[in-house]
């Protein structure tokens, strides 16, 4: 008997073996899901640090509105992730904070130097750096979602699947919006 595990939207399904199928029926959450949620909380926290700079570094209304949207959605998602971890009796990891594994930064995370450059920039230079860095940051979140869904058994519960899918959709929309803003400012 072939057992087919559906892929995330836009990704192919895959055939899984009997052991994987049995394991999937017994899962409440996976280590990959816990790592994803813990890492995404840290990732979102850096995005909040970036959006906080908008109030003093730009006068563009569209940048302010973008920042407010990102700020609101990321704060709501951080709260949702805290609750997800708490319901499972899992704490936020202190290990690695900005690092995923092997001492490497999580995908899309800004380095201390990039954050310094952003914090010191003003006006149109700030706007450009903010958009470039936030696009990079959002692309990193997409990589994290892809890695979650590539992990065996991860993303199978409806709550984590819905959350990760929403992160994917929101980040893609915001990347499109920011890319258009960046292109518009270059004209």
Model-derived features: where do they sit?
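All-alpha RGS (Regulator of G-protein Signaling) helical domain and cognate RGS-like helical scaffolds
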Residues: 1-187
């Amino acid at each position: 008997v072939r057992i087919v595990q559906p892929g995330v939207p836009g990704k192919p399904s895959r055939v899984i073996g009997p052991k994987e199928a049995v394991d999937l029926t017994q899962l409440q959450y996976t280590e990959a899901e816990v790592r994803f949620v813990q890492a995404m909380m840290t990732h979102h926290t850096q995005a909040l640090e970036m959006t906080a700079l908008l109030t003093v570094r730009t006068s563009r209304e569209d940048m302010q509105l973008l920042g407010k949207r990102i700020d609101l959605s990321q704060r709501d998602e951080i709260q949702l992730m805290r609750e997800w971890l708490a319901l499972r009796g899992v704490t936020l990891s202190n290990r690695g904070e900005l690092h995923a594994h092997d001492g490497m930064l999580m995908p899309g995370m800004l380095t201390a130097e990039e954050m310094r450059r952003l914090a010191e920039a003003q006006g149109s230079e700030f706007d450009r750096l903010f958009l470039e860095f936030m696009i990079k940051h959002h692309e990193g979140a997409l990589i994290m979602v892809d890695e979650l869904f590539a992990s065996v058994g991860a993303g199978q519960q409806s709550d984590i699947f819905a959350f990760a899918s929403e992160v994917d959709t929101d980040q893609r929309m915001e990347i499109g919006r920011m890319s258009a803003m960046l292109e518009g400012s270059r004209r």
